[in-house]
Amino acid sequence: MLAGEAEAGRLRIAPRCIMTGGETLGKAVRDRLVQVFGAQVRNSYGASEFLPIAWECPHGQLHVNEDWVLLEPVDEQMRPMPPGQRSHSVLLTNLANLVQPLIRYDMGDQVTWSGQRCSCGSALPVIEVRGRSDDVMQVPSQRRGETVSLLPLALCTVIEEECGVFDFQLRQHGPSTLV
């Protein structure tokens, strides 16, 4: 990570703004970038099939680039989700790619459509990205006798903030075994 190189004195840059994307940006990573570089940090949401789906505004909200994409949060039966409820997945229609159009492409991402206008003044819709559905770990609950869903962001937040470890891999070998 560039922050580590800057802390070690091997990288001397002073960016005004750092744009991130590719993975969910956790608070610990954001805070570290701000501390090391003293710059604004802005996240984006995209996919290999289309960049950018949404950009973070100065107020910390992700605004859907709806001039170029249609984004449809859906439940497990592919029915539209109302604002304020987390989707099972999201369907993407790319309005910009005339060579290889994507129409209602199931991305597998869990998002929540805000339904509220952002205080930054943008008319673009606001979403919260929770992560990829197939990245969610299912672990048994000792108390309730059912499974509990662990989102990658929740695990990353604890490991990054409590242990200061930013590069790691978890492997689930069984219902209750993480390595």
Model-found features: residue ranges?
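Active-site glycine/GP-rich loop and adjacent strand/helix microenvironment
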Residues: 1-179
